[in-house]
């Protein structure tokens, strides 16, 4: 066959494409269970971290997550557990950020007087700006933060050094993401209050 012909070019392109698509499909099939297991562990880790439990190893995540109970309250799926002898709840959320959906977990005490943690699972925010919501310093602000008047406030400026006042430092340069997080967190607090019968 003439290597300069259109027929050869089309057949060669088809054969190479077929081989690479086949290899890609086989790789996908071989790793689908691993990917699903890793996604499940990441989700469970996020729930545990939002409840105030710090876990890192996958085996530890699976072990600790066995103590978490999935509870249905008013059609919502909540996760209930005990941390240091106190009942805590966590709820997955999805809300609109600047560029897309922010998916995370918010944890609260049973009496809704304070948050126990925040964990961001996925987002589409700008790397280096709004994407900083996944950084430890941002998420740790919600560990033990008081919830005065059923609201959290994301602030800008010099920083919030008064821990436990219901104010969270926003991210400099990511005003829209910070505003979105305030809306999402307060919406979730309202939802949790309705589900758990808070005042």
Predicted regions and their residues:
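Flexible, solvent-exposed loop/hinge segments and secondary-structure transition points
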Residues: 2-199
């Amino acid at each position: 066959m003439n290597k300069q012909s259109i027929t050869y070019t089309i057949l060669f392109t088809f054969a190479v494409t077929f081989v690479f698509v086949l290899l890609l499909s086989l790789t996908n099939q071989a790793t689908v269970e691993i990917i699903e297991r890793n996604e499940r562990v990441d989700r469970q880790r996020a729930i545990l971290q939002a409840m105030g439990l710090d876990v890192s190893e996958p085996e530890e995540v699976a072990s600790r997550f066995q103590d978490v109970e999935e509870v249905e309250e008013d059609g919502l799926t909540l996760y209930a557990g005990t941390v240091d002898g106190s009942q805590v709840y966590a709820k997955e959320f999805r809300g609109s950020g600047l560029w897309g959906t922010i998916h995370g977990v918010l944890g609260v005490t049973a009496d809704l007087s304070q948050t126990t943690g925040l964990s961001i699972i996925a987002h589409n925010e700008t790397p280096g700006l709004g994407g900083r919501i996944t950084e430890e310093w941002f998420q740790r602000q919600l560990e033990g933060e008081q919830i005065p008047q059923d609201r959290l406030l994301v602030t800008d400026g010099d920083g919030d050094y008064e821990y436990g006042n219901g104010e969270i430092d926003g991210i400099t340069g990511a005003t829209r993401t910070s505003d979105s997080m305030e809306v999402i967190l307060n919406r979730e607090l309202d939802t949790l209050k309705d589900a758990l019968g808070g005042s």
